[in-house]
Amino acid sequence: MSKKPLILGIESSCDETAASLISENEQGIPIVLSNIVSSQVEVHKEFGGVVPELAARSHIEKIDLIVKKAIDASGRRVDEIDAVASTAGPGLIVCLSVGLSFGKAFASAINKPFIAVNHLEGHALSPKLSKKLNFPYLLLLISGGHSQYLNVQGLGKYIRLGTTIDDALGEAFDKTAKLLGIDFPGGPQIEVLAERGNPNKYNLPKPILNKGGCNLSFAGLKTAVLKVAKNIKTDKEKFDLAASFQKTIEQILYKKTKIAFKEFEKQNKTKEKIFVVAGGVAANKKIRSMMIRLCKEENYQGIFPPMDLCGDNAAMIGLVGLEKFKIKDFSDLGFPAKPRWPLDEKALFLKGAGIKL
């Protein structure tokens, strides 16, 4: 029986300090031996959002302990680790630098290869941690910082089909929650409040719904929510607005995903039609339910990461590290932190461009 690679994954791109040990079985299926995540919710709560300097300081204070916990929980020894994989971008540069520097130093100390990982690629491949997944597949990546449709051809091979031209979906959820007086991080609570409201009470806009192809826009929706929120006086109205917002998001994603299906099918002649939804917002149960229904309608196999792997974590970083290790795709210790690092580097940068569609 050949020794299987053991990879230490490290994540610090925003406000989670995380470490994980990843290996694989004889069939080549990834195995998560440990996955430790330390959240900074309490650190940023009073500010209503992530404060980069405070986040970086928290990473510095915790990262060595989190890595030790991950190694201890895995039941493996430091001298068994074959490579260290750290998130190098995209993200907050002061936060990225902590995990990146620690990972490089750790790899150097144990004289093992270092692997720089794209955080978005971690999300893109995360379903492989719980399910065998063949390329190509269509990916909807929805998180606090990104919202995009991607044709995933293989490791490091991505074709962007559409992206947000302004706010990310997770950002829209969090800002709506803030307008409703919900403490940070409020995005997940929108779904809870929506269960108690009337989703048809407010007719909210669906920007670029019938144009722009697979591109998305949420800034206009956020502005509309602000106008309604200013006049809310009762909890019932708050619940109704949350429900209306949730329903509007579902309608936007339903329509745009159908367009993405057609684009994906134009580019791929494969018989197996696979659709993956990943990122923090993929934990939204209403969105999951809607996507499952849509996949049945369009004969797609819908795949979602487990709930605990939707948000930022190091298991997905270790997974990318494992895949890169197997093809000896190692990184130089001088590899820089990249605040912006698109998966499809040939795609036009749209966010904030003020383009007209």
Annotate each language-model stretch with its function:
Residues 5-80, 86-90, 119, 123:
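N-terminal beta-alpha supersecondary unit
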Residues 1-5, 116-138, 320:
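Conserved phosphate-binding catalytic cores of ATP/NTP-utilizing and phosphoryl-transfer enzymes
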